[in-house]
Amino acid sequence: MTTAIEYPSAMAKARFVRISATKARRVIDLVRGKSVEEALDILRWAPQSASEPVAKVIASAAANAQNNEGLDPTSLVVATIHADEGPTAKRIRPRAQGRAYRIRKRTSHITVIVESRPPKKAGKQGASASAARARRAQASKAATKKATDSKEGSE
C-alpha cells in the first residue's frame, strides 16, 4: 500500500483554444513530468503550432504558483497536463456542382497543474552505483592479472 505525497500545486486552464486536441496532445507529451523551465525551453523551439498556446498555459500556471501560492519558481514541475476537446465550430465550404463540404474548426481545453517538488538528491544512489562498478572492474583486473601470472609461472 503506497501513500501519495501531496506537493503544493497551482493550476491554469486555457479554454476554447483554436487548435485541435490531438495536435495539442502531441506537444503536451513532450513536456509532461519536466521542470517548468525545461518545458518552456522545449516548447520555445518546438516547430508545432500548438507549442505556443501550451507554453502560455504552463507560464500562467507557474505565475499562479509564484504569485498566489508563494512557491519557488525554480522547483516547479509540470505534474499534470492534458488537452480535452472543446466545442467544434462548423462551417460550410462551397464546392463544384452545388455540393458543399463541412469544415470543422476544432477547439480544445488545455489544463496544467504544476507542483513544487524538492530537488532530487543525486549524490547517494549515483555514487554507490559508480563505486560498485569501479570495485567490480578492479576485481576483474586483479583476477585477469593473477591468471596471466600463473600461466607465465607454469611455463
UniProtKB/Swiss-Prot annotation:
GO terms for molecular function: rRNA binding; structural constituent of ribosome. Residues 146-155 have a biased composition (Basic and acidic residues). GO terms for biological process: translation. InterPro entries: Ribosomal_uL22, Ribosomal_uL22_bac/chlpt-type, Ribosomal_uL22_bac/org-type, Ribosomal_uL22_CS, Ribosomal_uL22_sf. Keywords: Ribonucleoprotein, Ribosomal protein, RNA-binding, rRNA-binding. Residues 109-155 are annotated as: Disordered. The keyword rRNA-binding applies. The keyword Transcription does not apply. GO terms for cellular component: cytosolic large ribosomal subunit. HAMAP family: Ribosomal_uL22_B. Belongs to the universal ribosomal protein uL22 family. This protein binds specifically to 23S rRNA; its binding is stimulated by other ribosomal proteins, e.g. L4, L17, and L20. It is important during the early stages of 50S assembly. It makes multiple contacts with different domains of the 23S rRNA in the assembled 50S subunit and ribosome. Part of the 50S ribosomal subunit. This is Large ribosomal subunit protein uL22. It comes from Mycolicibacterium vanbaalenii (strain DSM 7251 / JCM 13017 / BCRC 16820 / KCTC 9966 / NRRL B-24157 / PYR-1) (Mycobacterium vanbaalenii). The gene is rplV.
